[in-house]
């Protein structure tokens, strides 16, 4: 049986895959599992937030109904970024948090993820326990034992204050464009940047429930690049639908991705003696150029499988303060318990302002090797690891590249695709090898074969 939880909670087409009924059952099962890891004898409490997708309204109602019927007090936070829900799980002393979002996915999709006490993502083992209890857990609270439901009207203010107070220096004098992806960051990211002193131009800041991530945000930087150039801004910051990731655009229109952002922040923390154990945690998808730059700076690199949850697990295990993914999920563990796009963007801008150097120049701390990523759809991703032909082709490509590049082929944890990533000394060489491997994957794993 396929595992219900992916690398970032449960996702699917809202109303078909992620139904009100399934969401209700997940909430009831979570209410049975998560308070067991809370404080004995204390009435369970949960916070619930969502991004602005229209389907979030009925899914929120299902979550609240499930939790309250299981005897959990519920604090509705409204529309907030995922990291804000994680922060408020701890800030409001909740036993757990619930976020409804499908992150960078299109508007018809939605998802549900849980945070444990303190705002940390759940381990695979805890998610498996919730999944095992689906349909078995009983919402048996009656009378005075049913959960009460309240709204926290200060949630946005609490989060913005937290962001601004985390900065090592202000952003006065910087002109910044922020793309809110018509998502949860709308109205929050611009205000946080303004309070930190920046001159802000906001785009993608008019969510209507159906336009989230549509032609905007961290997975589509064209609008941000155009706005940065049009307004003569010092930098642009882009978030995804739930604002747990960040990508940047420099004044010259060049893209500064998650690897480059991590390189800048790692050196900032290193110089301030705040990079715990002089270590940066990344995933196997990070560019080889980042690894070489950190080695030259004397910073140790710890590598994990793809998924910010695995980055976080390694960070907590080793007491490290910085880690993340090339996609822009970056964790500043001294200030947050999970990837926070707003926090990341503001700390990047603080580094730009403190050094008085253009972002494009600052990003040159690492030399990014040409990288090609091909997403192969219409294939059975579950057979990747068992295909001898694919393994042989990958080995041949690795031998061809030697020390001047690398190959990574893996199934997506959140989508029905296989990702083929190749790095090489030239874009053409990387593209040719990636295309060749993608053709093998299609031929070998095609669902229609």
UniProtKB/Swiss-Prot annotation:
InterPro entries the record matches: A-D-PHexomutase_a/b/a-I, A-D-PHexomutase_a/b/a-I/II/III, A-D-PHexomutase_a/b/a-II, A-D-PHexomutase_a/b/a-III, A-D-PHexomutase_C, A-D-PHexomutase_C_sf, A-D-PHexomutase_CS, Alpha-D-phosphohexomutase_SF
Catalytic-site annotation from UniProt: 103 (phosphoserine intermediate)
EC number(s) from the headed UniProt entry: 5.4.2.10
A GO molecular-function descriptor: phosphomannomutase activity
Top class in the EC scheme: isomerase
A Gene Ontology BP annotation from the UniProt entry: UDP-N-acetylglucosamine biosynthetic process
Post-translational modification: Activated by phosphorylation.
Gene3D superfamilies on file: Alpha-D-Glucose-1,6-Bisphosphate, subunit A, domain 3 (3.40.120.10), Alpha-D-phosphohexomutase, C-terminal domain (3.30.310.50)
Post-translational modification Phosphoserine, affected residues: 103
Cofactor: Mg(2+)
NCBIfam families for the chain: glmM (TIGR01455), PRK10887.1 (NF008139)
Cofactor binding mode and count: Binds 1 Mg(2+) ion per subunit.
Catalytic activity, as annotated: alpha-D-glucosamine 1-phosphate = D-glucosamine 6-phosphate
Family note: Belongs to the phosphohexose mutase family.
One of the record's GO cellular component terms: cytosol
The keyword rRNA-binding is annotated on this UniProt entry: no
Pfam families (UniProt xref): PGM_PMM_I, PGM_PMM_II, PGM_PMM_III, PGM_PMM_IV
UniProt-annotated binding residues for Mg(2+): 103, 240, 242, 244
Protein name: Phosphoglucosamine mutase
UniProt keyword annotations, A-Z: Isomerase, Magnesium, Metal-binding, Phosphoprotein
Name of the gene this protein is made from: glmM
């Amino acid at each position: 049986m396929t595992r219900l939880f992916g690398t970032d909670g449960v996702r699917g087409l809202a109303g078909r895959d992620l139904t009100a009924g399934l969401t209700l059952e997940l909430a009831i099962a979570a209410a049975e599992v998560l308070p067991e890891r809370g404080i004995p004898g204390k009435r369970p409490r949960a916070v619930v937030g969502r991004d602005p997708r229209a389907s979030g309204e009925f899914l929120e109602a299902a979550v609240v109904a499930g939790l309250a019927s299981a005897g959990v007090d519920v604090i509705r936070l409204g529309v907030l970024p995922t990291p804000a829900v994680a922060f408020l799980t701890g800030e409001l002393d909740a036993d757990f948090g619930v976020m409804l979002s499908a992150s960078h996915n299109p508007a018809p999709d939605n998802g549900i993820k849980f945070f444990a006490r303190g705002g940390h993502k759940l381990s695979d083992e805890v998610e498996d326990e919730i999944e095992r209890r689906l349909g078995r857990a009983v919402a048996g609270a009656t009378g005075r034992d049913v959960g009460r439901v309240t709204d926290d009207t200060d949630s946005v203010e609490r989060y913005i204050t937290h962001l601004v107070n985390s900065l090592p220096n202000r952003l006065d004098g910087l002109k910044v464009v922020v793309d809110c992806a018509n998502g949860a960051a709308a109205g929050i990211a611009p205000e946080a940047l303004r309070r930190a002193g920046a001159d802000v131009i906001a785009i993608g800041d008019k969510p209507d429930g159906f336009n989230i991530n549509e032609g905007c945000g961290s997975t589509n930087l064209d609008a941000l690049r155009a706005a940065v150039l049009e307004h003569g801004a010092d930098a642009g910051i882009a978030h995804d639908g739930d604002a747990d990731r960040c990508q940047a655009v420099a004044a010259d229109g060049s893209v500064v991705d998650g690897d480059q952002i991590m390189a800048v922040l790692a050196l900032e923390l290193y110089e301030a003696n705040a990079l715990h154990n002089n270590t940066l945690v990344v995933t196997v998808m990070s560019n080889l150029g980042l690894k070489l730059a950190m080695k030259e700076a004397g910073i140790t690199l710890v590598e994990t499988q793809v998924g910010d949850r695995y980055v976080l697990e390694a960070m907590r295990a080793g007491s490290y303060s910085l880690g993340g993914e090339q996609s822009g999920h970056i964790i500043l563990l001294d200030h947050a318990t999970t990837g926070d796009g707003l926090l990341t963007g503001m700390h990047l801008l603080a580094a730009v302002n403190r050094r008085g150097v253009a972002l494009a120049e600052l990003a040159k701390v690492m030399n990014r090797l040409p990288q090609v990523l091909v997403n192969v759809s219409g294939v059975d991703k579950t057979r990747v690891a068992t295909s001898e032909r694919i393994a042989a082709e990958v080995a041949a490509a690795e031998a061809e590249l030697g020390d001047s590049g690398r190959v990574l082929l893996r199934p997506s944890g959140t989508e029905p695709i296989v990702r083929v990533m190749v790095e090489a000394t030239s874009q053409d060489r990387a593209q040719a090898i990636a295309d060749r491997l993608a053709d093998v994957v299609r031929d070998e794993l095609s669902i229609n074969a």
